[in-house]
């Protein structure tokens, strides 16, 4: 259950009281008490002060998912949020923009080569170090994000997903691997690059789906076609892909 802090002696209490009287049991075992949404200066929003932001206008301008992503990754749900429309613009440009560019990069070269993820999976030990590093980071991310969601920490989960997407996939892997997609022949190295990037994008779509359900669903359908991401299996980390030493050495 989730409600504002003002409902501590209202809705929260009423549900427990009624459930105990009728069913002799508590109504819920986990509760999130939402903080207040303030203006960018930390003042309470009000029509009188003229500092209120129209949520429907923001959704119309940026979309529901960028707005939700900004609010969840900016502060924990139980903390007060200083809302700044510039922050929504930044999230749209950096995270969603980078993610869209990365998908477009993959789609462009895949269409040119007629590539589909139908070929046999290239074994991990036969992939270049760059690919093994990224897959190690991806599987570490899966474990961390799963733990965050299970502990009701969506803010940490969103920040981890965003950092991986922007820093490791877009700014690092794609930039350093561009030439691998240029060759005419479908070499094992090129195949590995395709499979690695595809796997990352597909997994990102699944991991981000609780926070950005519409964008994640579109990304997943564009990649895999067919059913919704919300009907897919939640990704499971492969410990055999995780190489902590490789991750540390690449971080240096």
Report residues per predicted region.
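Structured secondary-structure scaffolds
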Residues: 1-112, 134-177, 181-182, 195-208
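Acidic, turn-prone loop/beta-hairpin segments
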Residues: 113-143, 174-252
